[in-house]
From Swiss-Prot:
Any one GO molecular function term: structural constituent of ribosome
Protein name as it appears in the record: Large ribosomal subunit protein bL27
GO biological process annotation, one example: translation
Chain segments carrying region Disordered: 12-33
Ranges of compositional bias, category Low complexity: 19-28
Pfam families attached to this UniProt entry: Ribosomal_L27 (PF01016)
Keywords: Ribonucleoprotein, Ribosomal protein
Length: 96
């Protein structure tokens, strides 16, 4: 607004929403079966983004990198070299 050559400015900022104040729900990633646990074929063992843990024996990897059991057996988390980890499922009679 321009009155007599003076320009008037708002003395309060517009009442818009704040820039923060958003948060997305957690994705429920991580281990779904523990080391030494007995599971059935098809059971999800580990949900992940990217290949944080690699599939080992009798473990499949889904399109979203989820690891799941291919056979009934016992879960075993193992080291794969110095920096990598893998998870395997050993049939119950083989695990003993």
């Amino acid at each position: 607004m321009n009155i007599l050559g003076m320009k008037l400015f708002a003395h309060h900022k517009g009442g818009g929403s704040s820039a923060n104040g958003r948060n997305s729900a957690g994705r429920r990633l991580g281990a779904k079966a523990g080391d030494g646990q007995t599971i059935h074929a098809g059971t999800i063992i580990y949900r992940q983004r990217g290949t944080k843990i690699h599939p080992g024996k009798n473990v499949g990897q889904g399109g979203d990198d989820t690891l799941f059991a291919l056979v009934n057996g016992v879960v075993k988390f193992e080291r794969l070299g110095k920096y990598k980890k893998q998870v395997s499922v050993y049939p119950a009679e083989e695990a003993k």
